[in-house]
Regions:
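N-terminal secretory signal peptides
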Residues: 1-17
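N-terminal secretory/targeting leader peptides
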Residues: 2, 21-132, 140-141, 147-348
């Protein structure tokens, strides 16, 4: 909550459990030096949490933006970052930011449990590249989503942060066509859209919070998972997976959201400065991800993953035949769907 001294990173870290102890401890150590800088006597202290490793490009650019905010406001606004699920899983933090216990949160697919239309940019195979993605989320589609986010007591900042196109990793077989997905135990985020898509393709999807995925893969609770290459690398999934199939089945990004009641305690000029600098950080992070994606495949091959390129058309046809697109067109509504197709082209 704003204007209260944030809980120390050390105290928060003691709440992590299981495999989280390994990943979060590493993140907390990095967070202490990279993300934990704070002013001694700021007028407004804000807590910002996310479930991403401290080394992820989002956390690096967020830390830079928070430093810039502190400087631009002459130390009046101090945002302390808690990466790596130090404040709980994504579902927990979404509840916290709604209640005001957390001030700012970078939220991805779990937002769809409250605002279903927030998942629409992630419709399977909607965008072949980033040009279409940024045109949509920086344009009318993003504006529509931000307006909906405002109905649950949150403020969504203008620029989405990039998570990337998602790829499938498995421990038992590569995925070359839809038949290879039949019966696969696949971890998916806590999101109805993801569960619906992979069920339509014949998998056995299991919704698991990100911080628990490594353990689920290690103990064979699931055979595989799907995430962008940056997260596959940062979370070290290559240690417990053998194959990476470049399906590029969904793009996903993160909204930077703030508790409206808390955020409006800041004077307008400080709010505008905070939003402007965090938006700038988002745009820089998009460029970071584009650069990183050029080298990640080579790096992950060196770490033991075997890659295969996938023809996406059979997957799209299978989803269309299963009624996936028609189902979600009905759920999102005609206005939102037509807005999406202005950027993606016809999907259903």
């Amino acid at each position: 909550m704003i204007s209260r001294r944030a809980v120390s990173g050390r105290a928060v870290l003691t709440r992590t459990v299981s495999r989280r102890t390994v990943l979060a401890a590493a993140g907390a150590i990095a967070g202490t030096s990279v993300l934990g800088r704070r002013a001694q006597a700021a007028e407004f202290n804000l807590k910002y949490g996310n479930d991403l490793p401290a080394t992820h490009p989002i956390n690096k650019r967020a830390a830079e933006a928070c430093d810039a905010i502190r400087a631009a406001t002459n130390g009046r606004v101090d945002i302390q970052i808690f990466p790596n699920s130090q404040l709980g899983g994504s579902t927990d933090m979404l509840s916290q930011v709604r209640s005001g216990a957390l001030d700012i949160f970078t939220v991805g697919s779990p937002l769809a449990n409250l605002i279903p239309v927030s998942a629409i940019p992630s419709i399977a195979f909607a965008f072949p590249n980033f040009d279409g993605v940024w045109a949509a989320v920086d344009g009318d589609l993003g504006a529509h989503i931000r307006q909906q986010v405002g109905t649950i007591g949150l403020v969504a900042f203008d620029k989405m942060w990039d998570n990337g196109f998602r790829q499938i990793t498995t421990s038992n077989r590569p995925i070359n066509d839809p038949n290879d997905l039949k019966g696969l135990k696949l971890r998916v985020p806590v999101s109805p859209l993801f569960t619906s898509m992979f069920r339509a393709l014949g998998t056995s999807p299991t919704a698991i919070n990100f911080v628990e995925v490594y353990t689920a893969l290690q103990t064979k609770v699931v055979d595989g998972q799907e995430n962008p290459l940056a997260l596959i690398d940062a979370a070290k999934f290559y240690e417990v997976q053998k194959f990476c199939s470049l399906t590029g089945h969904m793009w996903e990004g993160f909204w930077m959201v703030a508790n409206r009641r808390n955020f409006e305690q800041l004077p307008q000029d400080l709010r505008e400065t905070t939003v402007r600098l965090l938006n700038q950080g988002a745009v820089k992070q998009r460029d970071d991800m584009a650069t990183l994606n050029v080298t990640l495949e080579t790096q992950l091959k060196q770490k033991g993953l075997t890659f295969n390129i996938v023809n996406k058309k059979p997957f799209q046809e299978a989803l269309k035949a299963a009624g996936f697109y028609a189902e979600w067109r009905g759920k999102f509504g005609e206005d939102a769907w037509k807005t999406l197709e202005r950027y993606s082209g016809a999907l259903s």
